[in-house]
């Protein structure tokens, strides 16, 4: 593991498209070798998102900052593959601490938001007041337990490079499991021995 991206991770659409191309160009290898398929990723992601709420057949949406975002292709790709609406902040409204999507047939309550917008921009009433990307009042609906936001606000703290060396120990402590993938060797320059090693090996 090189780094952890929990805030708004991206790149899976490129992996899926690359695999499709590889399976076409290298069909013999894929036929002869037991390589695990990944084409069910969108359905598994949708099931995982749906399982984050106790509601039966929840309304899941992907919240995008828009087409000028570098990962917009992925947002649209996943929405299409998962068969869920791709929404912008202006498509959603909060009433009585519940989130609704403006639809052709009226408002539809949203149960799970797979957000692809960074924390400071998701709710102008709670964070950056000049944000036009988020949904006014979203955090009040979230705090009331009326909508699930994935990844939850604040998860970006785990992206911090200072936490990276501790992730294997956190997995062992909180999950009582061994990490599946090892981290690369990491030196913390605040530790005298690590600092010495880094300086000696520049």
Describe each region flagged by the PLM.
Residues 1-202:
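Domain-scale recognition of functional cores that engage charged ligands
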């Amino acid at each position: 593991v090189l780094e952890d991206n929990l805030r708004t991770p991206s790149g899976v659409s490129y992996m899926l498209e690359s695999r499709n191309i590889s399976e076409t160009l290298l069909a013999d290898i894929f036929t002869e070798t037991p390589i695990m398929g990944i084409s069910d990723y969108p359905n598994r992601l949708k099931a995982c998102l749906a399982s984050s709420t106790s509601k039966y057949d929840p309304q899941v949406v992907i919240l995008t900052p828009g087409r000028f975002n570098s990962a917009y292709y992925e947002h649209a790709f996943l929405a299409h593959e998962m068969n869920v609406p791709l929404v912008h902040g202006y498509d959603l409204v909060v009433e009585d601490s519940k989130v609704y999507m403006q639809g052709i047939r009226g408002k539809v309550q949203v149960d799970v938001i797979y957000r692809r917008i960074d924390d400071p921009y998701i709710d102008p009433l709670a964070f950056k007041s000049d944000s036009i990307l988020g949904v006014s009042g979203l955090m009040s609906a979230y705090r009331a337990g009326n909508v699930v936001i994935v990844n939850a606000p604040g998860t970006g703290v785990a992206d911090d490079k200072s936490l990276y060396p501790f992730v294997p120990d956190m997995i062992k402590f909180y999950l009582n499991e061994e990490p599946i993938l090892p981290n690369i060797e990491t030196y913390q320059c605040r530790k005298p021995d690590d600092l010495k090693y880094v300086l000696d090996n520049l």
